[in-house]
Every structure is written in C-alpha cells, then in structure tokens.
UniProtKB/Swiss-Prot annotation:
Tissue-specific expression: Expressed by the venom gland.
Keywords: Acetylcholine receptor inhibiting toxin, Disulfide bond, Ion channel impairing toxin, Neurotoxin, Postsynaptic neurotoxin, Secreted, Signal, Toxin
Gene3D superfamilies: CD59
Protein name: Long neurotoxin LNTX-2
Note in the entry: Has the length of long neurotoxins, but only 4 disulfide bonds, as short neurotoxins.
Cross-referenced InterPro entries: Snake_3FTx, Snake_toxin-like_sf, Snake_toxin_con_site, Toxin_cobra-type
Disulphide bonds in the chain: 24-42, 35-63, 67-78, 79-84
GO molecular function terms listed in the Swiss-Prot or TrEMBL record: acetylcholine receptor inhibitor activity; ion channel regulator activity; toxin activity
Secretion signal span: 1-21
Keyword Signal assigned: yes
Gene Ontology CC annotations of this record: extracellular region
Organism: Demansia vestigiata (Lesser black whip snake)
Organism classification: Eukaryota, Metazoa, Chordata, Craniata, Vertebrata
Family membership noted in the UniProt record: Belongs to the three-finger toxin family. Long-chain subfamily. Type II alpha-neurotoxin sub-subfamily.
Amino acid sequence: MKTLLLTLVVVTIVCLDFGYARTCLKTPEVKSEPCPPGQEVCYTKAWRDRMCSFRGKVIELGCAATCPRQEPGKEITCCSTDDCNTHP
C-alpha cells in the first residue's frame, strides 16, 4: 500500500509542471527571459522617433499580463507562445 502511494506521489510530481513561466524576447538585449508570474503575453512595439531616418524604427519587446493598448503611431503585436515576439 505504501509503495502504491509513493508511486502516485512521484507520478503526480513528474506530471505537474511546477513553476512554469512564459518566456519572451526582451529588449534591449533581445534575449529570451522568463516572464514574471501572471504575465503570459509576449508583445512587440515598433514606432518611429526623430532619429528614425538614421537608425530605423524603435523596437520594444517584452512580457505583459494583457496585450498593450494601441497607441497612435505605434505598431503593437501580441502572441502567447514562448519566444514568439521575434525582432521585426
């Protein structure tokens, strides 16, 4: 009986994924990092600033609890799988 109980406990621990965290690419390093608890959405924000003609669009990558709101002049895309917010 104890062996059966121990087996069930081991199987439960192996099957459950304790501590899983979504991973998203984050700037400025454009590096995959785990998101804080509760943040399951990866996002990409792109916009033009005064230096755009020299360096191109400003890109921000990160994690959020929900997709950030659209803002005038900013392109925002969201996804919900690991490292899905690739650098454009």
